Curated annotation (Swiss-Prot):
Stated family: Belongs to the bacterial ribosomal protein bS21 family.
Gene (name only): rpsU
Organism: Caldanaerobacter subterraneus subsp. tengcongensis (strain DSM 15242 / JCM 11007 / NBRC 100824 / MB4)
Full protein name: Small ribosomal subunit protein bS21
Pfam (any one): Ribosomal_S21
Keywords: Ribonucleoprotein, Ribosomal protein
InterPro entries: Ribosomal_bS21, Ribosomal_bS21_sf
UniProt xrefs under HAMAP family: Ribosomal_bS21 (MF_00358)
Length: 61
């Protein structure tokens, strides 16, 4: 989890900006969206295969 300590002369806005940057680098929001609902292993495999198909089509042109 991202943790930010606010300095004495630091504004809350800049600390919040640092916190958001750390969260995005750590992938907190993407992990949250991924775990929002349970996905069975078969559904995960289907999604992974579909993403690979899309990538192959996109870069194959």
């Amino acid at each position: 989890m991202a943790e930010v300590r606010v300095g004495e002369n630091e504004s809350l806005d800049s600390a919040l900006r640092r916190f958001r940057r750390q969260c995005s680098k750590a992938g907190v929001l993407s992990e949250l969206r991924k775990r929002e609902h349970y996905e069975s292993p078969s559904v995960k495999r289907k999604k992974k295969a579909e993403a690979a198909r899309k990538r192959k089509y996109k870069y194959g042109r």
